[in-house]
Amino acid sequence: MLDPEMIRRRIGESLPPGSHVEVVDTTGTGDHFEARVVSEAFVGKGMVQQHQMVYAPLQDLLKTGELHAHALKTYSPEQWQKLGNR
């Protein structure tokens, strides 16, 4: 069973300082997660590229099946602010 904090840490360590990562276990089973990530690294990148950047540090968990499902919401800081968030 995976811990949301471990997932958050892996994603956060792969992105520039100042990135914001939130991870929630959506089923309580430790294998289905949802992440919301805000990072300058996403500026100028399409959604597919952004998601690839987030999935990269999780590849080993996806390959072994430890991480079964991971829903992503990724934003540049500007996109995040346009949604009314700070």
Which functions belong to the PLM regions below?
Residues Y55-R86:
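C-terminal structural segments of small proteins and small subunits
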Residues E34-H51:
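A short interface-forming secondary-structure element
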Residues V24, H32, H51, H68-H70:
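Histidine-centered active-site/metal-ligand motif
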Residues I7-I11, V48-G65:
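Short, non-transmembrane amphipathic alpha-helical segments
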Residues G28-G30, F42, P77-Q79:
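Short Gly/Pro-enriched loop/turn and capping motifs at secondary-structure junctions
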